Amino acid sequence: MTNIRKTHPLIKIINHSFIDLPTPSNISSWWNFGSLLGLCLAIQIITGLFLAMHYTADTTTAFSSVAHICRDVNYGWLIRYLHANGASMFFICLFLHVGRGLYYGSYTLMETWNIGVLLLFTVMATAFMGYVLPWGQMSFWGATVITNLLSAIPYIGTTLVEWIWGGFSVDKATLTRFFAFHFILPFIITALVIVHLLFLHETGSNNPTGLNSNADKIPFHPYYTIKDLLGVILLILSTMSLVLFFPDLLSDPDNYTPANPLNTPPHIKPEWYFLFAYAILRSIPNKLGGVLALILSILVLALLPFLHTSKQRSLMFRPITQTLYWMLVANLLVLTWIGGQPVEHPFIIIGQLASISYFSIILILMPISGIIENKLLKWSL
């Protein structure tokens, strides 16, 4: 009798995706973040669903409904902080996942990579809208500042902003639609994740060497299921430590003050995971230029397959580009720091220099170093 997992129409799909999937035998722990992102998404959807049962998307009651969840709902504080800190863990895993793709040349799998970039944009949009929902000071002013950026678009900018707001300022209509979008987007993300995996399993995974691994593949289960399980345990451990010991470590104290349109906070800034992009936005004095730089800071990832000049896929044996890669990582940390600082000297100039070097490393220096390494290895023929 044939095994049911190989014959049943539905179980067969799961079998080919997570059990009998041929996987390179040498993929490291950097390949764990895909499954961890899946776990983060599941946690966010489940906790979000429970929060939505008690939350009210109305400007008069939104803030107090969040307080009610924390005070009166059974384990409401746990659900709320799991959701808030789960977003931070989600972005940590996302950045590490993208960083691994950049280091090991996974962007050469074009379809998978492009869906991944689209996923990154969608997750960022979802997180931004979620930050508006508690209707604290930073929620309100963050929503005002970021949506107002669209007014930089020529001709239709102002109309577009008022259309998104549903009025002449961020108000009840804005909050209601943001809640609706924040609720629906995770399910769209889930659909995109399935497409992401579909494209990945079409070509097979990359590996640290960047070489073809078809000659040496092992089944995903039990080897990588047990390896993923270790990652899952570590993620849950670190998330629960954050939630139970330092729940407000990554949030803004201003968001514990109810939204007040008449009182602007001293420093308007987004959540920590958007600070690098916010720093790039602020580094350009022109409004439209800033918006374009902001979009390009993420969209530049989609250009990576076209900027790949090396004959080698991975950075494993490319010391010059490795150095540039770690310079880029350091640069992003500097941008994250600058994004949280006030707009004054010396932070302005540091932000501008870091923004220039961010785009220079990706668009100019890395492709040049690829060509140099080819020459050094006499592979340019």
UniProtKB/Swiss-Prot annotation:
UniProt keyword Heme present:
yes
Annotated residues for binding of heme b b562: 83, 182
Gene3D superfamilies registered for this protein in UniProt: Cytochrome Bc1 Complex, Chain C
Q: Which GO terms describe its cellular component?
A: mitochondrial inner membrane; respiratory chain complex III
Q: What does this protein do?
A: Component of the ubiquinol-cytochrome c reductase complex (complex III or cytochrome b-c1 complex) that is part of the mitochondrial respiratory chain. The b-c1 complex mediates electron transfer from ubiquinol to cytochrome c. Contributes to the generation of a proton gradient across the mitochondrial membrane that is then used for ATP synthesis.
Lineage of the native species? Answer: Eukaryota, Metazoa, Chordata, Craniata, Vertebrata
Membrane topology label: Multi-pass membrane protein
Q: Which GO terms describe its molecular function?
A: metal ion binding; ubiquinol-cytochrome-c reductase activity
Organism this protein belongs to? Rhynchomys isarogensis
Q: Pfam families of this UniProt entry?
A: Cytochrom_B_C, Cytochrome_B
Swiss-Prot/TrEMBL cofactor(s):
heme b
Please provide the Gene Ontology terms (biological process) for this protein.
mitochondrial electron transport, ubiquinol to cytochrome c
- Cofactor binding summary note: Binds 2 heme b groups non-covalently.
Which protein are we looking at? Cytochrome b
